[in-house]
């Protein structure tokens, strides 16, 4: 993949039971201590540095999910690795150096939210890149016409 792509992390996925990767029910892999990750399933109080709000879903959850997936796929240098009716794992590659960030979305239709996790593979700091990526996606999703 390239010198700056790093290794795909273990434990990715939206874990729906406590046995899966040691995570709590309905959660992504926790962020490490590094400030280069955001996660909507992080504890808002205990892990405020990594916490980011999930995307609210109004209307039909399946349509909102399809819109979110289409928005991710429309971003340049994105490779979708895994896609299902409720989970998406994509790799974002930076333009200049080819750094790879791992981005996950998970639809929780009953809670009317789409959970999100975005993390850099390499380095310690991301200068807010993962948080900015999620907020851009949030803005595009909010601006998308209801289907």
Residue ranges and their predicted role:
Residues 1-147:
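Ser/Thr-rich, low-complexity intrinsically disordered terminal regions
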């Amino acid at each position: 993949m390239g010198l700056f792509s790093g290794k795909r992390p273990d434990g990715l996925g939206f874990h729906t039971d406590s046995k899966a990767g040691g995570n709590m029910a309905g959660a992504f892999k926790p962020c490490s201590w590094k400030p280069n990750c955001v996660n909507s399933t992080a504890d808002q109080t205990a892990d405020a540095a990594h916490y980011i709000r999930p995307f609210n879903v109004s209307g039909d959850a399946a349509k909102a999910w399809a819109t979110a997936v289409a928005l991710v796929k429309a971003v340049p240098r994105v490779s979708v690795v895994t896609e299902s009716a409720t989970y998406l794992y994509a790799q974002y590659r930076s333009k200049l150096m080819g750094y790879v960030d791992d981005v996950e979305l998970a639809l929780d239709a009953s809670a009317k939210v789409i959970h999100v996790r975005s993390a850099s593979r390499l380095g310690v700091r991301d200068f807010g890149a993962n948080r900015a990526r999620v907020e851009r996606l949030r803005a595009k999703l909010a601006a998308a016409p209801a289907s």
